[in-house]
Regions:
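Terminal (and in a subset, N-terminal) low-complexity or junction segments at the ends
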Residues: 1-157
């Protein structure tokens, strides 16, 4: 519980000093156009299809034994709500968009402005296996190349 209190204090101090947290965003390019997504973003015209694909992937991942890493959510909320938050991370939305707008077998390339969290890293490994796709994610730390359930970083990032 101390971590939540420390995090809350830090956020208050940041706010008092005028320091703003950079919102997470991920983007992909399709047909020469950049599509940018934020956490929980439903502004895209294909949002219904994107979230349908996220739900479908979530069910398939759970069958494979996936359990969301709720510890990475820095809010003092119920685990069920934390799971809901994790599903809507920007890189997952960008990947789902790519899955519904590209041909099977095509590589997916996503750029993210922040570091990929451990839950998303695990989920993307599974998504690469489920979809038989190469998924390349460039976060602010490194390139991750996911293929058949494995990442080029060997889960060290």
């Amino acid at each position: 519980m101390e971590r939540w209190e420390d995090a809350a204090k830090l956020r208050l101090e940041m706010k008092a000093r005028g320091v703003e947290k950079v919102p997470a965003s991920s983007w992909v390019e399709l047909d020469g156009k950049v599509h940018e997504f934020h956490v929980g973003d439903k502004s895209h015209p294909l949002s219904d299809k994107i979230y349908e694909k996220l739900d479908e992937l979530g069910m398939e991942m759970k069958i494979m034994g996936y359990k969301p890493t709720t510890e990475v959510v820095m809010f003092d909320i119920e685990d069920e709500e934390k799971e809901h938050t994790l599903v809507h991370h920007s890189e997952k939305i960008a990947i789902a968009f790519s899955l519904v707008t590209t041909e099977p077998g095509e590589s997916i390339r996503v750029t993210k402005n922040l570091r990929v969290c451990s839950d998303c890293h695990t989920a993307i490994r599974l998504i690469s296996r489920i979809t038989n796709r190469e998924i390349i994610v460039r976060d602010n730390n490194r390139f991750h190349c996911f293929r058949d359930g494995y990442c080029s970083c060997n889960d060290y990032w």
